[in-house]
Amino acid sequence: QHLPFQHALELVRKSSIFTTHTPVPAGHDKFSENLMRAYFAHIPEALDISWDEFMDLGRVKRTDEKFSVTHLAIKTSVYVNAVSKIHQDVTREMFKDLYRGFFNSELFIDYVTNAVHPKTWMCGDWQKAFLSVAGNEFFEHMHENHDYWKFIDKLKPLSIWKLKTYQKHELYDKLVERLAKEMPQRQELPNQIIHTLEELNKTPEILTIGFARRFATYKRAHLIFIDLKRLASIVNNPQYPVRFIFSGKAHPSDKAGEDLIKRIIEVSRMPEFIGKIIFVENYDTELAKLLLKGVDVWLNTPTRPLEASGTSGMKAVMNGTLNFSVLDGWWAEGYVPGGGWALRQENTYDDPNLQDQLDAEMIYSTIEDEIVPSFYERDIEGVPQKWIEMIKNAYFHIAPHFITKRMLLEYDNKFYKQLFEYYKTLSDNDYQNLFKFISWKRKIYRNWDEIKLENIEMFDSSKRHLPLGDKFYVKLLLDLKELKPDDVIIELIFGKKEEGRIVDIEFAKTFDFVGCEGSKSKYECTIPMEQSGVYNFSIRLRPQHPLLA
């Protein structure tokens, strides 16, 4: 298309969305200027820009700051989205320096919570069960009509329990098969291998808690091992035993993640935990599906607020497996009482070690006081009625909100349609609107620092208080230089103050353009005072254009 760089950049930006998937630093690569020169020294010349202009695409300020790939993505995308509501707040805080002059709540960093594809992740037995009571149209309509999920109520509790028990037996059969090969390969002692396999063969019906995912340190796989004595009493309860099954992989360069796996295997070899703490190697999609449908509880213990979304718990819900997780990521939106268990959203301690100890204590107590009784309390048919009700609640109230069709529609309605309109507008008529828009932006840059406040008239609260019901007013006279009144928007902003600083906008009102005084532009803003108190306010001037975003 042979567009100049700034024009091409604008066209790319107006047709791009950047989805950020993690707040963890490892997910946001940064490179030194020397390293960038080694690989990209030829790029600026090809783009007809300077080296500093190229580097500025990945920096907040022109300093010795490293080149951030994430900053590059944000600067070259008109929309940015996180993958859960909490992740949106975290992302806004992370990248606020890229949006000078705006509060976090104003930043156009939106969110679309992740979701999963039910037909891919719901096991065949559950699919058949739903189709048997909801009809063949279940998968077609379960997104827009959540009542389809309530058809599970037509399944008898005994049928649900038999289905779930069958899935667990299938999991245990596969585990025995895999561990019989894996344990000798990792040089486990013969008596430990025999004891572990015997335990799995004879006790597949015990409460089974699964933890399987990437072993990053923020996932806190170590949490339940903080108090081994307490853990031993839980897993070895003579009447109500519990088994934990772990699986996952660490990144080859993540030494801390590898150490977590080593610790789990180390604990699993202790006499009191043989057969009760299991680590399964070679985690893959096949094993993930077995665990998701076969365990009773899906455990997730991330460090707050580093769980951008998480999807394994959604997949667990699709298979009648109950979640026990920190209220972070998707679970902060999905959790309903009676549909799983939760650790509170906020940290209690600034010290991560103390927070880990508290969370571990809460996990132990929740397992002992809530999860174990709900699982082991049975009726005359041997069915845990309370547990079955929780499975139903999870299907009723959680599963319908985390389906890929919902996610795709949100992306389409929030972003894709507007991106199409932007691109069409800018590219029509051989890019005429694009060239006009770039010319307008250059005019803004050329004149912005020259705008002059000629006069300001406003109510003087230092002389007298403004009675309730009266109007607070501000009148401005501006010299906009080459700019027109339509090129700018002026706002009267009232700030929310916490601990001596303005942290957010309480409310804002746009000034009205009321005419010209010679070559100067006149603006007015009036606001009725409906509440008493001390107000912190400011005036903000910013560019405006239909294509500015």
PLM region spans:
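Catalytic cores of carbohydrate-active enzymes across secretory and cytosolic contexts
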Residues: 1-549
